[in-house]
């Protein structure tokens, strides 16, 4: 990833800058940026060949002697003999010689130096050509020397002085340019490193941003799911609360129903107890009447019995009528009530057993009669023992008197 970012960070302007810095680092100060050179020697040769401003200035300020013109003519006549290689550099030779003569005339000093010292880093072809031209010029100037013109030593000293000064200037310029190039190279490397760091930081921040966006989307999905779940749970909670309210209402209704049923049960129990007590009283009265009838049958006073029963009918009806709303006065006593209950239960059991034993005989002679007919009193002239034991009585005797039915 970092390698890709580094490759992307290289732009075309960097390549072009590197190409310019490596290929053509030096430019001509007079021609401008469109004229650039690969090395200082090429720039120096260009300046010497194309821009000779000092020579032109000296030529305009000073007047040349006729001997100088003759010397130039002689040198120009000897130049075609040097061949094709020396033809391109003939102009340089004339300019150098005229420059040396003018300088020696104006200043008039000389130094013993060698005329063949050349500047370092000059092309080999230029050095050879310049040396050959100087040798040829010296050989031509030797016989033409005159007392009024500068000598060869003065010319050589001036050339050496100019070369030394030019070399020092070029070296200073070279050092300055090299320092500036080194400084710019360091700054460029520093800026490139900073740019790479910024690119790496930008890529890292981009990755972090993408990661944050991904986490944000995941959290948004989780929040949406949580909101949906909360909504579903709220709906379920509402439904549960409504169902709970319905159940509570049902429970309240059921409690009311149970309370009403309990009240009805209590009332029913009370009514049943009253009914049983009334029934026991009636059974007790029937038992007393039966005992009385049996005692009358045993004594044989049937007539008195019928009259007595007719006289006792109102008294027997009274307890029954009173039992509907009021109990009999005898049953109000607790001891008598317990006694009556025990006697009533024993009598009911006894009557049930007797009925079960007499039912087959009754089915042979006549159809079954109602239980009330079993306790029907005998009429006048009718034997009571037969009616109790065997129920052998005629069909005409089945008619019940109204008084006996009301008693039971």
UniProtKB/Swiss-Prot annotation:
It is found in: Cytoplasm, Cytoskeleton, Microtubule organizing center, Centrosome. Residues 170-298 form a coiled coil. The keyword Phosphoprotein applies. Induction: Induced by gamma irradiation. It comes from the Eukaryota. Disruption phenotype: Basket cells with reduced branches and short processes in the somatosensory cortex of adult knockout (KO) mice. Reduced expression of the gamma-aminobutyric acid-synthesizing enzymes Gad1 in the somatosensory cortex of KO mice. Delayed myelination in the corpus callosum of KO mice during the postnatal period, but recovery by adulthood. Decreased dendritic arborization and increased spine density dendrites in cortical pyramidal neurons of adult KO mice. One of its GO terms (cellular component) is cytoplasm. The keyword Cytoplasm applies. GO terms for biological process: cerebellar molecular layer morphogenesis; dendrite arborization; dendritic spine morphogenesis; gamma-tubulin complex localization; mitotic cytokinesis; negative regulation of neuron projection development; positive regulation of oligodendrocyte differentiation; regulation of DNA strand resection involved in replication fork processing. Detected in several tissues, with highest levels in brain. Also expressed during embryonic development. Expressed in cerebral cortex, hippocampus, striatum, inferior colliculus and thalamus. It holds the Pfam family zf-C2H2_FBX41. A zinc finger (C2H2-type) spans 26-51. Contributes to genomic stability by preventing telomere dysfunction. Involved in the morphogenesis of basket cells in the somatosensory cortex during embryogenesis. Involved in the positive regulation of oligodendrocyte differentiation during postnatal growth. Involved in dendritic arborization, morphogenesis of spine density dendrite, and establishment of postsynaptic dendrite density in cortical pyramidal neurons. Involved in the regulation of neurogenesis. Negatively regulates neurite outgrowth. Involved in homologous recombination (HR) repair pathway. Homodimer. Interacts with NDE1 and NDEL1. Interacts with DISC1. Interacts with PARP1. Interacts with MCRS1. This is Protein ZNF365. The gene is Znf365.
